[in-house]
Amino acid sequence: MYLDICLNIQLIGFGMNQLFKALNDPTRREILEMLGKKDLSAGEIADQFNMSKPSISHHLDLLRQAGLVESVKQGQFIYYSLNTTVFDELLKWMLKFRNPKKK
């Protein structure tokens, strides 16, 4: 219950703005698609794009700040995974608008 309240607060206002900003970029959406299949290191993600590693790092940082991905450092590598809880909360919020006249 407490976690649900915290996540709902995160999705309201600034957190929601960060979330939609992160989803607004095609590179970040592609990164999310990749992470939906398996966890990847920053280097593995960067290898899939024709852009600099600092640019990919910036995209990953925005996704992390929005709560869409989580990162774990293992030795000299940083591994990224989806934070599916935020996606669940976003879907729950969006479904409220599906048919507001029926309850």
PLM-predicted stretches and their roles:
Residues 1-15, 84-103:
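Amphipathic alpha-helical dimerization/coiled-coil segments
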Residues 29-31:
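Pre-recognition alpha-helix immediately N-terminal to the DNA-recognition helix
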Residues 34, 48:
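Residues within the alpha-helical elements of helix-turn-helix
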Residues 37-43:
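Short capping segments at the starts of secondary-structure elements
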Residues 41, 52-55:
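Helix-turn-helix DNA-binding motif, specifically the short coil turn and the N-cap/start of the second
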Residues 47, 58, 64-65:
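Alpha-helical residues within the helix-turn-helix
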Residues 64-74, 81:
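Beta-hairpin "wing" of winged helix-turn-helix
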